[in-house]
């Protein structure tokens, strides 16, 4: 089961994300946060597999919240959401620890495949190092 924390300051976007994700039986939305500060706290409390976070949030930006989440729980996969920002902001979000940044306009077709791909990508280094270790 992929446990997901949704972070967006607009309830309508939260509901849209829920509606998209509830179509997939391997996804469980475990919580919702409305700002960056709540995102960091909920991530520590709920320990989601994936955090889907808007880049532009009140209190703490999505970028800063991503950095803090990854600092506290490096195994968490973070996906950024944007309504359209400059490339340098997307790059900065990736540098903060986001596995990917999605356009809100592409959520219906891209959200689930991006979650799966980001999880596969994040598992590769751990799997490779674990398989290279000798068994005792």
Predicted regions and their residues:
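The feature encodes the CheY-like receiver
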Residues: 13, 58
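Short hydrophobic/Thr-rich beta-strand motif most characteristic of the beta2 strand and flanking loop
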Residues: 26-34, 42
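Acidic catalytic/metal-coordinating carboxylates
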Residues: 35-38, 61-64
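Conserved phosphotransfer cores of two-component systems
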Residues: 44-46, 68-76, 96
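Active-site beta3 strand of CheY-like receiver
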Residues: 46-52, 57
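Alpha4 helix (beta4-alpha4-beta5 surface) of REC/receiver domains from two-component response regulators
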Residues: 64, 85-113, 117-118
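CheY-like receiver
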Residues: 113, 120-136
């Amino acid at each position: 089961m992929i446990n997901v924390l949704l972070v967006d300051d607009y309830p309508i976007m939260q509901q849209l994300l829920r509606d998209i994700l509830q179509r997939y039986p391997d996804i469980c939305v475990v919580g919702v946060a409305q700002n960056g500060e709540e995102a960091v706290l909920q991530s520590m409390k709920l320990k989601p597999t994936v955090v889907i976070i808007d880049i532009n949030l009140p209190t703490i930006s999505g970028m800063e919240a991503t950095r803090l989440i990854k600092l506290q729980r490096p195994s968490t996969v973070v996906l950024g959401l944007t309504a359209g920002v400059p490339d340098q902001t997307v790059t900065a979000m990736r540098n903060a620890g986001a596995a990917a940044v999605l356009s809100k306009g592409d959520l219906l077709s891209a959200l689930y495949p991006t979650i799966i791909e980001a999880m596969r990508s994040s598992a590769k280094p751990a799997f490779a190092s674990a398989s290279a270790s000798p068994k005792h």
